[in-house]
């Protein structure tokens, strides 16, 4: 869990930007990004939010929260295809192009056009991916929006959490009392390697989980799980109560 007092101590007038993950892809813990933005702006710094885990399952209002830049992926909560994502930039924030050429807008110019978003979109765009991401956004709206999907996924995660908490050898990782968090439950079964548990779940019950380090070695160092890793259960809109109960029963069998 983020220590806001410690963060406030670290953010000084010399800080240029505070880069923060909205929700952890390891534990599901969420950060109060509006509070972080206020700290950053008080010191004259920008706030840049990684919303890869939260976009599509948590309401993000850049203006109301005071966010300068939000980065997101399309293949998680936004239900788009892999290889899609976006960068939302508040008005007045300048971002320099990282690649040049091939926009088809001012083809005889050596530099990128100044207008948005073309200045950051060199080369051929992923048209199929953009169409898929757009379809994902339409689907979310058709289901009642982000809040409706988040409530459903959170209910599944809470159902699962209540069941696995009764298994003595299960170790849980995360602050599950947070009012807003990602629908993730991460755990270990005794001292069994996380990859072994994940493989057993797939082979025995057809349950797909994510073991290992989750591309977050520093988080695992903080949790003390560098050797064992963690088994992550991520609950989505297409999961059911019956599938949750099957996962609980499977862990109960593996923990025996």
Enumerate the language-model features and the residues they cover.
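Pyridoxal 5′-phosphate
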Residues: 1-256
């Amino acid at each position: 869990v983020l220590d806001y007092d410690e963060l406030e101590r670290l953010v000084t007038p010399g800080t240029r930007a505070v880069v923060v993950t909205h929700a952890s892809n390891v534990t599901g813990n969420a950060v109060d990004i509006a509070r972080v933005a206020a700290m950053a702006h008080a010191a004259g710094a920008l706030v840049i939010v990684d919303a890869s885990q939260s976009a599509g399952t948590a309401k993000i209002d850049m203006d109301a929260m005071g966010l300068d830049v939000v980065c997101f992926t399309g293949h998680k909560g936004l239900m788009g295809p892999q290889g899609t994502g976006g960068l939302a930039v508040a008005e007045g924030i300048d971002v320099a192009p990282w690649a040049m050429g091939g926009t088809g807008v001012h083809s005889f110019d050596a530099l990128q056009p100044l207008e948005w978003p073309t200045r950051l979109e060199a080369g051929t765009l992923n048209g199929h991916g953009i169409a898929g991401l757009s379809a994902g956004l339409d689907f979310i709206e058709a289901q009642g929006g982000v809040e409706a999907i988040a409530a459903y996924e959170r209910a599944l995660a809470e159902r699962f959490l209540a069941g696995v908490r009764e298994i003595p050898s299960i170790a849980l990782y995360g602050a599950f009392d947070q009012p807003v968090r990602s629908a993730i439950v991460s755990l270990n079964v005794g001292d069994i390697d996380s990859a072994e548990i994940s493989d057993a779940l797939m082979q025995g019950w057809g349950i797909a989980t994510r073991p290992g380090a989750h591309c977050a070695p520093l988080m695992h160092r903080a949790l003390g799980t560098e050797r064992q890793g963690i088994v992550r259960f991520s609950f989505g809109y297409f999961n059911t109560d019956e599938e949750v109960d099957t996962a609980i029963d499977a862990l109960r069998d593996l923990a025996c």
